[in-house]
Amino acid sequence: MAGKAEPVGTSGRREREKAKRREDILRAAREVFFSTGAGRATIDDVAARAEVSKGTIYLYFESKEAILAHLVLEGLDILSGQLKAAYAPKKDLPAEERVRRLAHAYLKFSKSHPQYFRLLMAFDRGQFRERVPEPLYQEVSERSAASLRWVEQALEQGRASGQFAVADPGRMAGVLWASLNGVMLLLDHPLRQEILGVPLNTLFDSTLELLLHGLDAEPTVRRSSQTKKGAQS
């Protein structure tokens, strides 16, 4: 005997309710992770903030790390949009200018979205790899790599034009990212800035110029031309 037919529209309403509940949980998780940090945040905290049971959380997310992965993807979406705008693919820009624009877009992102920046710096610690479903983990990995590819493209452009002496643009993009990240993380505390006696922007720009000098195919020529420009101004 056939079961009673589900009323028209019931299935769609349930799906909308599930989607809303999931968004409510993510919103609560965002508040918890932003205020306490990824390391100290717990599923219990998220459940309390969302005003649902702990079991309800697990109906929508496999683990705390899975929630973190979704928040990381939110941050990567914002960062990717800002990097694309900085790269300006439709504009005819020198490779060096593109690298500078990308670097400063990254610095701006860290200041305008500090909570997302901190999640991006900390998300792969602990048991993130083991506790995030494989498809979700791969999405985070691929989207992270996609952001870095803007830098790689700028370096490839510089190599093609003869401006940069770069054997492996992909590897050098990683070097640039790691170096600038180091500066940003080091000075993400007022005491460290006080110890070094240098504000973040100054040290960031000095590091970027040092890296660009190392990439330059003709560093002596560029340095002398910059010196002449400075003398003429």
What are these regions (language model features)?
Residues 51-61:
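Short hydrophobic/aromatic patch on the recognition helix
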Residues 1-36, 40-49, 66-69, 90:
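Basic, helix-initiating cap at the start of DNA-binding domains
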Residues 34, 59-62, 70, 74:
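Base-recognition residues in the alpha-helical recognition helix of bacterial helix-turn-helix
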Residues 112-135, 185-189:
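Amphipathic alpha-helical segments used for helix-helix packing
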Residues 70, 84-116, 173-176, 220, ...:
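Hydrophobic alpha-helical connector segments
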Residues 25-33, 75, 106, 110:
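Short hydrophobic clusters on alpha-helical segments that form packing/core surfaces
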Residues 77, 81-84, 119-121, 131-160, ...:
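Amphipathic alpha-helical packing segments from all-alpha helical-bundle domains
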Residues 1-9, 105-108, 145-161, 179-189, ...:
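C-terminal peripheral helix-coil segments that are non-catalytic and often amphipathic
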